[in-house]
Amino acid sequence: MSFIKNLRTAAIAATLAISSLQAAQADEQFFPLQSYRVGPYAAGGTGFFGGFIDYLNLVNTRDGGVGGVKLTWEEGETQYEVERGVEVYERLKTHPGIAAWNPLSVGIAYALIDRVTADKVPLLTINHGRTDTTDGRVFKYIFPLLLNPYSETSGIVNYIAGKVGGEDKLKGKKIVVLYHGSPYGKETIPIYELLAKKYGFTVQQIEVPHPGNEQQSQWLTIRRAKPDYVVLRGWGVMNPVALKTAQKTGFPADHIIGNVWSNSEEDVIPAGDAAKGYVAITSVAAGTQFPVVQDIVKTVYDAGKGNLEDKKRIGTRYHNLGILNGILNVEAIRIAQAKFGKRTLTGDEVRWGLENLKIDEARAAALGAKGLFHSINVSWDNHEGDGSVAFQQWDGSKWNVVSDWIAPDWKLLRPIIEKSSLAYAKEKNIKVRTSIND
């Protein structure tokens, strides 16, 4: 009898243990992080993922999670390499309660499109990614939030037009695009050619092989070309090397326009005085003046839980972009919980939250992020969210905003995006959605 009693006790204990495990999993929303903290792009990786993790820590510590659901995460080092990124995906994809993937890598994002679609888990590519994934009718689970490569290009050309006296004054001008030799760098080749034809300027596109620590021949070519402006589509070490090499060849820094991955403190400080006057596009502001950043300092860093090793990087461009990425992920979860309940959500439910993600100035202020970014208005068929951009100029010690928020030319861009996305749908035999319920 004692044996049977003990067996029953053990069975009850095992059942309780399983129930406890299920409850623990039910109270967890998991983020698998394909981060990169070593290699030539470590500055971007440590800053962005540091900010992302800092915001998740803030929400857990200050708010007890989202609707009582704790936010958890695990990092996998990719070194910004596609193969490693896919390996991390395969290793972590079975973890319960995955909210979304956030690789911050165009190459990894491309490799995951079919995988996340099959697994029904969102993939967020803030400020980057495949341009036509903006069309949510075709790419149900991919979200190039705030800015895609084509809208970035439109913003840059609009800014240059303003500097030369208007769009009609672009005719006859020469623009060189110096781009990183990767899928990310090559993404905008077609749109620059299209805009050159539209406005009548000449464009010359020059590749810099990865990682970009030698550019002498490219800048000699630029010197011979004598362009009016150079657009720098760099990443990591390529950016300060470009600015220093430009100075050596006599090209003025204030006629170099950096893209969204050439706009951080880590891009200009190593270049020294060669960066003074340099201009770059941005979708997120730098600085620690924002209440959400101050909350992170007080709640996370003062408690010894901050993710950045160097506290001087708090509030820098990459760090603030990571914080903003955290805000967008968490808000999508909050919105989805309002519909599906305060519990662990499925990836598909988080996708619904993302397709209803709307943050105006009032909501941004409530989140402590007023002025950190402009706004976002995602819908089931527009996965970018009508992001706006601004331009900033480096004065040798800090970035100064030199423009208002600028909206891309959506009337021009949307038909181009849809043509590409519908061709992809035909190739992959994807049924084009007609509503959020599809």
Predicted regions located by residue number:
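Bacterial N-terminal signal peptides that target proteins for export
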Residues: 1-11
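Hydrophobic helical h-region of N-terminal Sec-dependent signal peptides
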Residues: 9-21
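Beta-alpha junction/loop-to-helix N-cap segments that form part of ligand/metal-binding clefts
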Residues: 28-30, 43-53, 57, 61-136, ...
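Venus flytrap/periplasmic-binding-protein-like
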Residues: 78, 124-125, 130-134, 211, ...
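Extracellular/periplasmic Venus flytrap/periplasmic-binding protein
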Residues: 84-87, 132, 140-250, 287-294
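Periplasmic-binding protein-like
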Residues: 92-106, 124-126, 174-179, 205, ...
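Extracellular/periplasmic periplasmic-binding protein-like sensory domains
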Residues: 139, 246-326, 405-409, 413, ...
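Segments of small-molecule ligand-sensing domains
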Residues: 307-319, 330-403, 437-438
